[in-house]
Amino acid sequence: MKSQKLKTIRTAVRAALLIGSAALLPILPSAATQSMAPGRQVAESGPSAPATGIRPQGDTEISIDMSQVKNPDLPKIFNYIDAHIDEHVRNLQKWIQQPSVSNTGEGIQESAQMVKGYFDQLGCQSTKVYDPGIAEWGQQSNPVVYAKCDEGAKKTLVVYWMYDTMPITQPDLWTRPPFAGDIVEQAPYKKVLIGRGAVNSKGPQMAQWNALMSMKAVTGKLPVNLIIVAEGDEERMDMGYRTFIKAHPELFKGADAMFVFGGQLGIMGGSEGCLFIELTTSGKSWGRGPVYSDIHGANKRSVDSPAWRHIKMLSTLAAENGNKVLIPGFYDNIVPLTAVEKAKLAEAAKKMKPDEAAKNLGVARFIADKPVDIVTMSRYGTSFNVDGIWSGNMFPGGSGAILPNTITSKHNIRYVPNMTGPDIVKKLRAYLDKEGYQDVKINVVGDVPWAKMHYDTDIAHAVEKTFKAFNIDYQQPLEDQASILGGYWPAYLFAGDPINIPIAGGMAGSGGGAHSANEFYVIEGAKKTYGMAGAEKSVAMTLYNFAGSN
């Protein structure tokens, strides 16, 4: 029996714009394989929910090497986290229960205030919700939440958050209500939390906040000063964040580095480039077919179709099932991988099991067969994706003959050094014009340039030291400045002028299903994957490492 909530969500989703976003491709090995079968519910959520009985260590087979824990406060913080893990999981459930869908606006304003409340509870002296106004590409931005916490420490760390999520596009596929935060069993884990935003990115961010609150509870202060900035437009190409950062660089004065959430596969900090566009074909611009509105579908017998023209146009942009971009000059500016980078990718590929990775991602198979090719494509590949397409009769079931007058498709285009978004748009426009599609409109929704990562920095060393102490088999760093990139996020706003600080991320913990049905975050770990308690402890240790206190 479908809940009324899911029916409401389904109705809203039909009207939503389905804009794609970034998530790291989980292709490296982990203990998890995402089961798409319904999980067995083991705990309910809500204010009157009973104690969840979380086992902090779960079934994780690896543990912290306490000989590498030098600061006497850290064992106390670890014990506090274990003792309060039920409460910490409930904190995440409450956050999941507050929708924050940036593409529809559902719950965005409430979520911004909720995040400000988290920063207030942390004791930050300055917290504020900013309205960035109209973004560069003409859309209304969502709020940015800023906090500054002066702990009297020597170093200051910027922490990046995003509080927005993707819409629920396939409600019937969810085994639990997407905004309930239910805890279920999902092999090999005894407890995972199901919910929109569970892994992307409320789960790891709540682990960070729980860790910060635990440090405050045990020691009364944090080992570093913090500047925390949370955006509500990550799933909309960071449009408001871009406006905010460019308008207020002074708010980051004195920052030494940035720490971002992440998983235990490796140290991250770089970002691929991502251009998001809409392509529109209309009878009015074309001069053929319906001009002012849709008309009866029977008229196709004698009237041209903008929809068919659009489909033909799309077929000229890519070949090989969409895996090869045909736009002239598209690949021209790509900087080849170095010998060291190729060697590291080959090393990482040895740990990869394609079948297991495909199952974890929820796909039948990857484009390539060889692990080294899959790893290389996922970390330094380019793509021209079809995120969605709509026109005419979009009503589920039934019939109804319509000849649409307009058709629009959405595309995220992933790019790497030294490609640029504006250059891609310029080449696309020239190619469409050459092929006779001068009437096709290109609308730039957003553009996030790529950013490389420096590994020889204090913050990167702090994360690496934590991974070693936690016995995490992570991907080893490459040479100092590497072109091996992560999924897109607005790293470029901090890696370049005027802020220009080193960036690194990575923490224990795991999850899956970002942007998908049954998105989950691991609560009790298994095998070589830590659960939420381990994730929180790793955050605490990284901050102490960065402060030079461990």
Tell what function each PLM region has.
Residues G152, L326-T406, R414-A430, D439-N550:
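An extended, acidic, His-containing surface patch that forms the Zn2+-binding/catalytic region
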Residues G39-G107, Q125, S271:
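N-terminal hydrophobic or amphipathic helices/low-complexity stretches enriched
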Residues N91, V101-K155, A180, A187:
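A non-catalytic alpha/beta surface segment that caps or lines the substrate-entry region
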Residues V192-E272, F276:
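Acidic/histidine-rich catalytic neighborhood of metal-dependent amide-processing enzymes
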Residues T280-P354:
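Polar, glycine-rich mid-to-C-terminal structural blocks
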Residues K2-P29:
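Gram-negative bacterial Sec-dependent N-terminal signal peptides
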Residues K154-I227, K528:
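Active-site metal-coordination/substrate-binding segment of hydrolases
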Residues Y163-M166, V229-D238, F261-L265, S285, ...:
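Acidic, glycine-rich active-site loops and adjacent beta-strand->loop/helix elements
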